[in-house]
Amino acid sequence: MVKIRLKRIGKKQAPFYRIVAADSRVNRNGQYIELIGTFDPLKSEVKINNELALKWLQNGAQPTETVRELLSQQGVMKALHEAKLANKK
């Protein structure tokens, strides 16, 4: 199963994360399939490629709780919901 999750790359006491699509069996900081965005919790700065995130979500990738909140803040989850409603019509 593919998950959209955070990969930590910052230094000690200075966390910085990449938002990645990765196989759920790979460890947190292991290989990933594709880079979707970044998250800096110290500056509360989130950069997400909305098109890539939507592509992975539509293909069945499961976001972790934290990533789901970040995607919601950026409007990606709303766009996914609207796309699903449009497909039903």
Swiss-Prot record:
This is Small ribosomal subunit protein bS16. GO terms for molecular function: structural constituent of ribosome. Keywords: Ribonucleoprotein, Ribosomal protein. The keyword Ribonucleoprotein applies. The lineage of its organism: Bacteria, Bacillati, Mycoplasmatota, Mollicutes, Entomoplasmatales. NCBIfam families: S16 (TIGR00002). Belongs to the bacterial ribosomal protein bS16 family. It comes from Mesoplasma florum (strain ATCC 33453 / NBRC 100688 / NCTC 11704 / L1) (Acholeplasma florum). GO terms for cellular component: cytoplasm; small ribosomal subunit.
